[in-house]
Amino acid sequence: NWTIQNVNIIFPQDEEYINYWFSAWNSFVVFNSPHSKTFSILREQYLLAIERLAMSPENWDAINNPFERLAEHLMLLYGRGQIEIDDPLLKKFWNSSPIRIRSHALRFIGGSLRSTKEIIPDKTLIRLKKIWEDRLRAAKSSPNQEESQEELEAFGWWFTSGKFNDAWAYKQLFQVLQTSGKIGDVVRVLEKIY
């Protein structure tokens, strides 16, 4: 396959060619959705992109932000069952990404849930609950509680999606408020409660 044979030419990994790598990677991640076949070919590039997240500028165009799109790709791959919660890609992503990128990942899931009209399969909801509970645990044990607040605020979008059973959703909402004192999408959260 031509792509497999040329992946290291398309995405040169030497530091001297970093600008070429960013051009190819940013174009790929912004203008494509993750697919299982492509992911298996580009897994190493995903890892390299995660390692380079620290280079993400604060003022990147929000619509075409390749760093946020990387987070979206990873969440889609996880939600579809193509990577697991303990996959090295996700571990590295959660452990090394700037807080705004981690928060974006969780808001992306919540926003996607809210905009989806179809019934989401139970196995997908179980996976999503698992990743949320993992992030909540990480936030509770984080030495940087202020930073964790931003990540936890994303649960507002999950809560207002209406995709989870009320017992689980209200329990998570209570834990978020108890841990961080803040919630995103607050107006819709209040509308749902009242």
Label for each model-derived stretch:
Residues 1-194:
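Non-catalytic all-alpha helical scaffold/repeat segments
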